[in-house]
């Protein structure tokens, strides 16, 4: 039961916006007895399981307590996808804003019953895979690190510019630069040499700061 609640909440998502729905889900569909392992995949996150074994197996393995209630299953999956988007948003705002908009469209279609449930599951599974991977399927192969991909997505998909900035940052960054103003200014100065725009420097710097590879 605890595990089902954790999956439904997306682990770290602030559920204030969903409290009424989640309370109904918990009160109606989850018994208050001791939890027990459901499958060998029980320690895997719901999104991991959707990507690695398919959405049908993920539902059967981790959402057994909601079996028979399609809306509850759908909302649980949606909450987990939304949670991932919120957690990763600052690392690549453009990509995750796009993913958030796609999620909103899928949710709206489900609630309006404008698509069959099987089609809904296919769409949400495809979106979950993109969110889990942190990149679109058509991303150029030269953008072979999360940092490069984030720069590409937030620079109007300018591949050459993304690679140039990636290389500039990696060749000019001082050790231990995060949180040290003088060292951060070294990187900003290097960025200005490429971008020639102070506002753009500040915007891109915030993304770079969120990327561990830099």
Question: What do the PLM-derived regions correspond to, one by one?
Answer:
Residues 1-214:
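Catalytic cores and motor modules of nucleic-acid processing enzymes
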């Amino acid at each position: 039961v605890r595990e089902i609640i954790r999956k439904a909440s997306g682990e770290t998502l602030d559920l204030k916006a969903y409290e009424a729905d989640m309370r109904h889900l918990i009160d109606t569909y989850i018994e208050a007895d001791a939890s027990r392992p459901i499958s060998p995949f029980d320690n895997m996150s719901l999104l991991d399981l959707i990507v690695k074994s398919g959405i049908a197996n993920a539902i059967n393995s981790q959402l057994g307590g909601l079996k028979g209630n399609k809306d509850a299953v759908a909302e649980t999956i949606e909450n987990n996808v939304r949670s991932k988007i919120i957690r990763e948003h600052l690392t690549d705002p453009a990509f995750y804003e796009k993913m958030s908009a796609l999620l909103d469209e899928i949710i709206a279609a489900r609630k309006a019953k404008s698509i069959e449930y099987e089609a809904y599951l296919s769409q949400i599974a495809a979106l979950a895979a993109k969110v889990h991977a942190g990149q679109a399927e058509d991303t150029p192969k030269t953008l072979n690190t999360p940092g490069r991909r984030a720069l590409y997505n937030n620079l109007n998909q300018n591949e050459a510019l993304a690679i140039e900035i990636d290389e500039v940052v990696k060749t000019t960054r001082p050790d231990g630069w995060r949180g040290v103003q003088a060292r951060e200014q070294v990187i900003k100065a290097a960025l200005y040499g490429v971008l020639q725009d102070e506002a753009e420097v500040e915007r891109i710097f915030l993304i770079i700061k969120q990327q561990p590879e830099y």
